[in-house]
Amino acid sequence: MANSLAIIADPKTGKTYKREIPSERMSSLIGRKIGEEVDGVFFDLVGYKMKITGGSSVDGFAMRPDLQTQGKKQILVKYTSGYRGKNGIRKRITARGSIIGSDITQINLKITQYGPTPIEEKKDDQQA
């Protein structure tokens, strides 16, 4: 399993930050679902709490909160994320489930509780 990427959104400032997740920490995130809160220790942010809002796999398929599975699934959709159909046209698309698996390369997070130190003060931070 390669290193994954965490995209952390700060609702106060409107900025996003990238953090690389080592494979040993990523293995402890496997099995978590979209909407769950995780501790900021996974991303070297002590005291922070974050909510998982989405992600994408190695293949580039987006995670969907309405699919309660870990793998890929083909679903029939009208107008939704992943497809913008017109006038009732439906299409079968491939999407990821809402459970984090070993093939997820990007996790999107939103800060829900702030820690003692601001994210901007971290030296190894890259702003997205």
Swiss-Prot record:
An MF annotation (GO) of this entry: structural constituent of ribosome
Keywords: Ribonucleoprotein, Ribosomal protein
Pfam families tied to this protein: Ribosomal_S6e
GO CC aspect terms: ribonucleoprotein complex; ribosome
GO biological process, one term: translation
InterPro entries: Ribosomal_eS6 (IPR001377), Ribosomal_eS6_arc (IPR020924)
Keyword Thylakoid set for record: no
Family that this chain belongs to: Belongs to the eukaryotic ribosomal protein eS6 family.
HAMAP family given in the database record: Ribosomal_eS6
Protein name: Small ribosomal subunit protein eS6
Organism of derivation: Thermoplasma volcanium (strain ATCC 51530 / DSM 4299 / JCM 9571 / NBRC 15438 / GSS1)
Annotated gene: rps6e
